[in-house]
């Protein structure tokens, strides 16, 4: 199943994913399938399965990142562009792109993570955040 990272505390090694039914699902770093330091960022899009944790409670297992903020940032860096976070007019988290002189290259109102990924050239069709 697909989900969006709600939050993840890298120091403590856990966080929550919002699943397709808008339910919070616990995730522990031991369940993340990636090389190196296992962590997630808010708004990362992941695939996961539901399973039982060590305490028997339901949690996300076999978590695999699909589209991450780091992937988007790395792609934009090649063009000497950078991501800034902001709050939109409704107080929601939004993103904008700036160049090395801090000149805005995207909408001043900000955009969603999926819009940011599309701006960076990623195929976001079929993904939901």
Residue ranges and their predicted role:
Residues 1-9:
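Structural detector for short beta-strands of small beta-barrel domains
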Residues 24-36:
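Beta-strand/loop nucleic-acid-binding surfaces
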Residues 51-67:
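OB-fold/S1-family single-stranded nucleic acid-binding modules
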